């Protein structure tokens, strides 16, 4: 159903500040697919809009129910998230279109009505293909010496969306990418295409308004590819938005493209991928359908009294106009949020189509959360449709709140509690368990056998072994069996790609690693004396000329003690050993041992440190020859249990980059063991 506005100009959604459009570049649509297994009938619908509020979609569902009989809790309606469509609600600095808002629910309902009228015998199938080259993390971590100021005047921005291409102020992505392009295809029993639902985690491309962006162009181009342009009833293609809260098409680690990205060209590439993938789909004449929904109560983050006072003072200076700056904009948001209830009911859904699972969340969801839902779901494959059945703003994973940025700034578009994302995951997984009748996956045991590297480490019987595959903190799980779990401290981004060699992972999953952005991991290891070893993989992101010490990888010593008594392994900076490994035993003894090899940044390296009494030896990248070798007294108190990963025991010069596969031994590893461990990983890509 065509839902392009009938009257122009209109206010356009998706920007911090107000913008309008008086031209329609391409048509907007509400597209619907209705499925029926003779027991359950469900409607899946996408709307070419940025966000659609729950009251609007509830109104559309009621109208559709009255026309079709489909229960309102068997309808999944989502916004595509084009940033070139009319606003349906006032967010940030955007204006409103009350006439368009009143007109739209009936048009959405009409899409459900027409799809229901076109029900016919069909077969269904699904598949998933990977498209990692077309979506990337758009939220990047800033250098520790270049932290930015938020609209409230606080120096808090360690991560931000859209850093710009190869911006030297930024280090690397703050989150993982979900590269899956999921496809559900419906055909007649004879093989004529009827409809297709795709799902991809990519925010939008960008198009001049009014436009459906690539979501609409994808539907048009796929219709042409399957050669059913004039079919009756017409073929309907839907592109739903996955968990793209922090994902976009730009790869900010590369040079800026010579030509701007066209939403039409982008849609063509994705449509061709889908078209090719459909050739290998196995179809089923019947599959069971099941759908459940719930509402999850989530708190609105409270405003502090000082911020509210400051907001009132600032908004008084522009009472007769719209905000023009970010401080003005967010001041107005604080006033508006101070007047809303302290809790929201967030709608969630789960849909089963045979062995396929679909989750629906009414928020802007980060890629990590989508990957977590996929990993835990009892149904395989599973994908998530965001901005479904309402709009409740960004829900960053909890660790991202410590890094700041506009997806964490308190506004109507980002106001839910810090723990919202894991609570959503838990509720959605419970719904998927209900519709499937199966328990969630645990990500351990025989379903996920270990690769050669972790097997080699475990065979050497470490006192502690942290693989750092966690989706979230605060617990860093010790996989040695010795119960030396660690604690992730704030300033860490989770679940990015770790050392990529197959030996480091298991046969089913990418090896994962956290990015340390000012945070560290601390743990207590019982039974350590002055003879012990530590090994790990690391990938430094901070330039070696940024500060006196580039960053500490490992530290053993009492926490927070002045002078940092202990063993400290790191990468030198401008003070000494620039870009090379160094060992330091604290300010009292001041023994510094420095390696010879310059450590290339943004590449994975393996390091092992062995203390045997006064002798300290460090090995790099599996070499039998020591990188560092010398005598250094232990300055930590006897039998010190405290160890730190990614930082020093006094918090000085914490590491900036990724660390993975950390093992500590209560004995000296031999050079031969270290070399064999490194070899077990295989060839590691940068």
Per-range role (PLM):
Residues 1-78, 82-236, 242-253, 257-268, ...:
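Conserved beta-alpha junction segments in alpha/beta enzyme cores
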Residues 36-38, 69, 175-178, 187-191, ...:
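Extracellular/periplasmic catalytic domains that process cell-envelope and extracellular macromolecules
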Residues 87-90, 136-137, 249-252, 397, ...:
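Short, solvent-exposed loop/turn and secondary-structure capping segments
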Residues 121, 179-181, 195, 234, ...:
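Extracellular structured ligand-interaction cores
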Residues 445-519, 543-551, 557-565, 633-634, ...:
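Extracytoplasmic low-complexity segments
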Residues 463-472, 532-542, 606, 652-681:
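Extracellular, beta-strand-rich glycan-interacting domains
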Residues 487-518, 535-544, 568-634, 649:
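Extracellular glycan-interaction surfaces
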Residues 628-658:
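Flexible glycan-contacting loops in extracellular carbohydrate-active proteins
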